[in-house]
Amino acid sequence: MGQKVHPTGIRLGISKPWTSTWYANTADYADNLFNDHQVRQYLTKALKTASLSKIVIERPAKSIRVTIHTARPGVVIGKKGEDVEKLRKHVSKLAGVPAQINIAEVRKPELDGQLVADSIASQLERRVMFRRAMKRAVQNAMRIGAKGIKVQVSGRLGGAEIARAEWYREGRVPLHTFRADIDYATSEANTTYGIIGVKVWIFKGEVLGGLPLTQEQPAQPKKKGRSPKREG
């Protein structure tokens, strides 16, 4: 059976950036890595209703800078910035250094893999038919401008006795092309029948030199015929 490599892992350093950008010596590396995990775990739990896309962590000179990418920045900030201040204090306590929190808004949540996967998972938990949830996500992504999208759900679909996987795809999702900008994400739906896994691949276009390519113009065909004779 053919196995698939993680679409983000294989593109790191080619067309995908790391979500933790810092350098540490051997003694501090493990502590920093575990610390990043704790910060992400806390923020994901605290901002469960804020439509989190990703959390980027930087560590400039004995401090920590956390950028929260979310579709609902108002929920993160809170009334007069009270909520974000609570988050900053807790992150600073976890990291043991001064913390700074930045918030980046996700303009098109329909094209964000993590937000699409979480949306499908929440629909499944609300007992929406899985085929309807998948089709709606695919149609919305294609309408907003995705070049292709694939959605897969697996588990006891519809309360069936035997677990299975079903997928739906529109457009093209070239997993073998390194320059393809593919946003891959997973999520889980906790239903009464057990956990249903959700996987989403969104193809947004091709990246060259770190920037998405615009639509290539077709080459103009050369005109046939004799070249004009020179006089003289």
Swiss-Prot record:
The gene is rpsC. The keyword rRNA-binding applies. GO terms for biological process: translation. CDD domains: KH-II_30S_S3 (cd02412). Belongs to the universal ribosomal protein uS3 family. SUPFAM superfamilies: Prokaryotic type KH domain (KH-domain type II) (SSF54814), Ribosomal protein S3 C-terminal domain (SSF54821). This is Small ribosomal subunit protein uS3. Residues 39-107 form the KH type-2 domain. It comes from Pseudoalteromonas atlantica (strain T6c / ATCC BAA-1087). SMART domains: KH (SM00322). GO terms for cellular component: cytosolic small ribosomal subunit. Part of the 30S ribosomal subunit. Forms a tight complex with proteins S10 and S14. Binds the lower part of the 30S subunit head. Binds mRNA in the 70S ribosome, positioning it for translation.
